[in-house]
């Protein structure tokens, strides 16, 4: 009798995706973050569902309802902080996952990569709208500043902003629709994740060498299920350490003050995972230019397949590009730091230089280094 997992219409799909899936024998721990992102998404959907049971999307009661969750609901504080810090873990895993794809040339799987970029945008939109829901000072002013950026769009800008607000300022209508979108988007993300995996399983996984691994495949289970389990345990350990010991480490103290349209906080800034993009936005003195730079800072990822000049797929054997890659990582850390600083000297010039470096490395220096390395390789043979 044939095994049920190979014959049953539904179980067969799971079998081909997670059990009998042929995987390269040499993929490293950098390949663990895909499954960790799946775990983060599940944690966020489950904790978010329980939070939504007690939350009220109304300007008068939103802040109080979050307080009520933390004080009166059984383990409400745990659910709330798991959701807030779970978002941070989500973005840490996302950045590593994207960074891995850049380093090892995974972007040559065009469909998988482009859906990944779309997923990144969707997750960022979801996180932004979620940050507005507690209706603290930073929630309100963050929403005001970021939605206001759309007014930079010529001709339709102002109308568009007021349409999104549902009025002449961020108010009840805005909060209600943000809650609706914040609730529905994770399910859209889940659907996109399935498509992401569907395209990935058409080609099979990449590996650190960037070479074809068809000749040396191993089954996903038990080898990578047990390897993923280690990653899962480490992620949960790290998340629970944050939640139970330092729940407010990554948050803004201003968000513990109820939203007040008459009182602007001294420094309006988003959550830490948006600071690099926020720094790029602020580094350009022109409003429309800043918005375009902000969008391009993420959309540039979609250009990577077209900017690849090397004959080698991975950076594993390309020391010049490797050096540029790690300079880019350091540059992103500088941008993250600058995004959290006030707009004054010397932070303005540092932010501008870091923004120029960011685009220069990806658009100019990396493609050039790919050509140079190919030449060096040709001469050495």
UniProtKB/Swiss-Prot annotation:
GO CC, sorted alphabetically, is: mitochondrial inner membrane; respiratory chain complex III
InterPro entries linked: Cyt_b/b6_C (IPR005798), Cyt_b/b6_C_sf (IPR036150), Cyt_b/b6_N (IPR005797), Cytb/b6-like_sf (IPR027387), Cytochrome_b (IPR030689), Cytochrome_b_C_euk/bac (IPR048260), Cytochrome_b_N_euk/bac (IPR048259), Di-haem_cyt_TM (IPR016174)
**Molecular function GO terms recorded:** metal ion binding; ubiquinol-cytochrome-c reductase activity
* Location(s) in or outside the cell: Mitochondrion inner membrane
Gene Ontology annotations of biological process type = mitochondrial electron transport, ubiquinol to cytochrome c
Q: Which UniProt keywords apply?
A: Electron transport, Heme, Iron, Membrane, Metal-binding, Mitochondrion, Mitochondrion inner membrane, Respiratory chain, Transmembrane, Transmembrane helix, Transport, Ubiquinone
Cofactor(s) in the UniProt record:
heme b
- What Pfam families does this protein's entry cite? Cytochrom_B_C (PF00032), Cytochrome_B (PF00033)
Note the PROSITE patterns from the entry.
CYTB_CTER, CYTB_NTER
Annotated heme b b562 binding lies at 83, 182
* UniProt cofactor note: Binds 2 heme b groups non-covalently.
Residues that hold a ubiquinone according to the record: 201
Q: Where does heme b b566 bind?
A: 97, 196
For this protein, the parts annotated as crossing the membrane are 33-53, 77-98, 113-133, 178-198, 226-246, 288-308, 320-340, 347-367
Instruction: Note the topology in the membrane.
Output: Multi-pass membrane protein
The miscellaneous comment for this protein is: Heme 1 (or BL or b562) is low-potential and absorbs at about 562 nm, and heme 2 (or BH or b566) is high-potential and absorbs at about 566 nm.
How does this chain assemble?
Answer: The cytochrome bc1 complex contains 11 subunits: 3 respiratory subunits (MT-CYB, CYC1 and UQCRFS1), 2 core proteins (UQCRC1 and UQCRC2) and 6 low-molecular weight proteins (UQCRH/QCR6, UQCRB/QCR7, UQCRQ/QCR8, UQCR10/QCR9, UQCR11/QCR10 and a cleavage product of UQCRFS1). This cytochrome bc1 complex then forms a dimer.
Function as written in the Swiss-Prot or TrEMBL entry = Component of the ubiquinol-cytochrome c reductase complex (complex III or cytochrome b-c1 complex) that is part of the mitochondrial respiratory chain. The b-c1 complex mediates electron transfer from ubiquinol to cytochrome c. Contributes to the generation of a proton gradient across the mitochondrial membrane that is then used for ATP synthesis.
Which protein are we looking at?
Cytochrome b
Origin species: Chrotomys sibuyanensis
């Amino acid at each position: 009798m044939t095994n049920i997992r190979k014959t049953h219409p539904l179980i067969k799909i799971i079998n081909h995706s997670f059990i009998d899936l042929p995987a390269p024998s040499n993929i490293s721990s950098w390949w663990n973050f895909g499954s960790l992102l799946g775990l983060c998404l599940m944690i966020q959907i489950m904790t978010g569902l329980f939070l939504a049971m007690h939350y009220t999307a109304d300007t008068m009661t939103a802040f109080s309802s979050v307080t009520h969750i933390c004080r009166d609901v059984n383990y409400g504080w745990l659910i709330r902080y798991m959701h807030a810090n779970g978002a941070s873990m989500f973005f840490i895993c996302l950045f590593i996952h994207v960074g891995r794809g850049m380093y090892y040339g995974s972007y040559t799987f065009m469909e998988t990569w482009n859906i990944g970029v779309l997923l990144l945008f969707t997750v960022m939109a979801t996180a932004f709208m979620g940050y507005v829901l507690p209706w603290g000072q930073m929630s309100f002013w963050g929403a005001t500043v970021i939605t206001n950026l759309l007014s930079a769009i010529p001709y339709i800008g102002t109308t568009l902003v007021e349409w999104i607000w549902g009025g002449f300022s961020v108010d009840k209508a805005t909060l209600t629709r943000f809650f609706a979108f914040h609730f529905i988007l994770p399910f859209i993300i889940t659907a996109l994740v399935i498509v992401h995996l569907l395209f990935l399983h058409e080609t099979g996984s990449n590996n650190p060498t960037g070479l074809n691994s068809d000749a040396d495949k191993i089954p996903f289970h038990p080898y990578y299920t047990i390897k993923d389990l280690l990653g899962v345990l480490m992620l949960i350990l790290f998340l629970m350490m944050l939640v139970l010991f330092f729940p407010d480490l990554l948050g803004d103290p201003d968000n513990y003050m109820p939203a007040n349209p008459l009182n602007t906080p001294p420094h309006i800034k988003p959550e830490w995972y948006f600071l690099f993009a926020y720094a790029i936005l602020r580094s350009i003195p022109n409003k429309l230019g800043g918005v375009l730079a902000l969008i391009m800072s993420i959309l540039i990822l979609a250009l990577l397949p077209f900017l690849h000049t090397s004959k080698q797929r991975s950076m594993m054997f390309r020391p010049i590009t490797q050096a540029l890659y790690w300079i880019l990582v350091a540059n992103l850390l500088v941008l993250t730091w600058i995004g959290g600083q006030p707009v004054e000297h010397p932070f303005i010039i540092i932010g501008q230089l870091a923004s120029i470096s960011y685009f220069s490395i990806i658009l100019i220096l990396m493609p050039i280094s790919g050509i140079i390395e190919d030449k060096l390789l040709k001469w050495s043979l």
